[in-house]
A protein has these predicted regions:
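Generic structural signal for well-ordered alpha-helices
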Residues: 3-4, 28-35, 78, 105, ...
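Residue-level marker for buried hydrophobic side chains located in beta-strands
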Residues: 116, 193-196, 289
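Short, electropositive alpha-helical surface patch
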Residues: 27-41, 105-114, 255-256, 260
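C-terminal cap of metal-dependent C-N hydrolases
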Residues: 269, 274, 279-301
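Divalent metal-dependent hydrolysis catalytic cores, especially in the metallo-beta-lactamase
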Residues: 2-30, 45-58, 85-97, 113-116, ...
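Divalent metal-binding pocket/active-site signature
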Residues: 52, 59-154
Length: 301
């Protein structure tokens, strides 16, 4: 409830509540809690559902996700989570190469859950096959996935090549350089890139503050990025979406229409809510954000 109420300060009108890899008990309680809030009522930005990130990830590309809880995907276990969530899981990140015969991928697609490839060691060919079975997006492109190489194209290469696959990308300038952001947006075009913050609950806390994320200690760096104190590895960000928009336009030199689409109509289309979200049209929700020239938020409606 606190997150929903305050995220409007950065111009966000709707979002997915996101989990991380944890034990079955913790994840079950987490999705049940989100469902309770959604159904009991809350103030602020609309919770469109749950983004279930983990535990169906690859060990090598797990990032800051706690490895002791990573498991192979099964339809049976996911059904239990979705039952606890009362059907509110709308988006799942998983390493689809771990999904035997794409069973969970196909089940999710058939039941209205968007499948996004992420924290994955999939090859280019495996990504193409997952796309053919209904995978629709990639989670934080460049990060937590096989890189591009001219002899091993990887997931990054698949993100570029599969034109009609959506791709999230963290636009803080730390997870990916400005040049990498520009390359991705200019290659992908205006319709399939999705800006994300990858922000943690530590958003808004002071520089140098320490927190527990998935059982691991993290610290907030001066640039707003979060790092594991044990290894120094990136563990997310504290980025505000309006600042991400400014970074894309002013630092990464991405055309404004590409940048604004990435945080409005593109994610709405990916989630299948573009009939009421993502653009100002007759009959849609009147979600309006007023920005100053410096991208600071004047008002969110």
């Amino acid at each position: 409830r606190n997150w929903s109420e305050h995220i409007v300060d950065e111009g966000v009108t709707a979002f997915l509540a996101t989990t991380i890899t944890q034990s079955e008990e913790v994840l079950t309680n987490a999705v049940r809690n989100v469902a309770d809030v959604m159904e009991e009522g809350y103030k602020g930005a609309e919770i469109l559902g749950i983004h279930f990130e983990g535990p169906y990830l690859d060990m090598k590309y797990k990032g800051a996700q706690p490895e002791q809880y990573i498991v192979k995907p099964t339809v049976e276990q996911f059904k239990k989570y979705q039952e606890a969530a009362r059907g509110h899981i709308k988006y799942i990140t998983m390493a689809t190469e771990q999904d035997d015969d794409f069973a969970l991928t196909r089940y999710c697609v058939e039941n209205g859950v968007v499948v996004s490839i992420g924290h994955s060691a999939a090859t280019y060919e495996q990504a193409v096959e997952a796309f053919a079975h209904g995978a629709k997006s990639m989670t934080h492109v460049y990060n937590g996935m096989t890189p591009f190489n001219h002899r091993a194209t990887g997931l990054v290469g698949a993100a570029y090549r599969i034109r009609t696959m959506y791709g999230e990308i963290i636009c803080d300038g730390n997870h990916s350089t400005y040049a990498a952001l520009n390359n991705y947006f200019m290659s992908k075009g205006p319709d399939y890139s999705i800006m994300i913050s990858d922000a943690l609950m530590a958003k808004g806390t002071p520089i140098g503050s320490k927190h527990i994320f998935g059982g691991n200690e993290i610290v907030i760096y001066p640039d707003g990025s979060a790092h594991l104190t044990s290894t120094g590895g990136l563990a997310g960000s504290t980025l505000n979406i309006n600042k991400g928009l400014r970074i894309l336009v002013e630092k990464a030199m991405v055309p404004f229409n590409y940048a604004i689409n990435s945080c409005t109509i593109n994610p709405a289309r990916c989630l299948g809510v573009d009939d009421r979200k993502g653009s100002l049209q007759v009959g849609k929700d009147a979600d309006i954000v007023v920005l100053n020239d410096d991208y600071s938020v004047v008002q969110t409606y």
